[in-house]
């Protein structure tokens, strides 16, 4: 499974990438903001992990763009962010985020959230 990891922090991208590798995923492409994420998003990407707050284009705007395209509308999306209040989680879900991880997190939490998204999507198919 190929992942797209979008975060403006190189350190955070490294943490997410290393966590993905620790739980068995090795095909990963990275981007520093939502606009870059959309540029590198191609049909080989099967799962998106994004931050919320980023310059140029934030995570929610990128999610809305992904959801608005028939080619990518059903792509699984996980948001990894420091925003943890209920209204933020609701707003992310309304934009089309499938699940939500609050920073900091462990590789195990990331794995559980990814598996949860994939199970829900499999059940909906």
Could you describe each region identified by the protein language model?
Residues 83-84:
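Short, conserved "switch-loop" micro-motifs in signal-transduction and mechanochemical regulators
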Residues 54:
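Receiver (REC) domain active-site loop signature in two-component systems and cognate sites
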Residues 1-11, 16-20, 48:
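Conserved acidic segment of CheY-like receiver
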Residues 30-47:
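Acidic, metal-coordinating helix/loop segments flanking the phosphotransfer/catalytic sites
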Residues 105-114:
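C-terminal output helix
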